[in-house]
Amino acid sequence: MLTHPRWTHIALPSCDLDASIAWYEEFTPHVVLDRREDDDGQSAWLSHAKQIENPFVLVLVMFWRDKGKRQPIMAPFAHIGIEMPERGDVDAIAERARAAGCLSWEPTDMPPPIGYICAITDPDGNVIEISHNQGVYAKVEEVWGGS
């Protein structure tokens, strides 16, 4: 039973849902959780596989009326952040993104609490930051204590 508010999802438009799903499965740890279709369009929910506790879902929505029209929402600096367990994970994603032509920010060490980051751009022009050793969860633990 829900006892307190929580983040659940962010929804972004997609001009080509299948291409976006393929991109997120290639360049992030996200996989399809659910797909839906109705008279207005299609949507897909993506999240980390089997993350049952505190999942966060990326909802991609392709409205039929906007099919084929890019609508970048998270750009040029606005972004979604994904933290990876290893620094090498950031480098591996950056290498694949560079080869695919979608690397926005080269991997770089930033001062604490930012950590080691790069950014990639999805098929709709949205920026996704990939990081390692970012201080977001550490700050939550420091301020509000463990779970």
What is each stretch, according to the model?
Residues 65-69, 101, 136-139:
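A short local loop/turn or secondary-structure capping micro-motif enriched for an aromatic residue
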Residues 11, 31-39, 109, 132-141:
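Conserved catalytic-core motifs of GNAT/GCN5-like acyltransferases
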Residues 3-6, 73-77, 111-112:
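Short glycine-enriched loop/turn motifs at secondary-structure junctions
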Residues 14-19, 80-127:
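Vicinal oxygen chelate
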Residues 1-21, 79-80, 134-147:
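N-terminal beta-strand motif that seeds the catalytic metal site of vicinal oxygen chelate
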Residues 61-63, 67-83:
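Helix-adjacent hinge/juxtasegments
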Residues 57-58, 127-130:
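Short glycine-/small-residue motifs
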Residues 2, 11-57:
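Core segments of cupin and vicinal oxygen chelate
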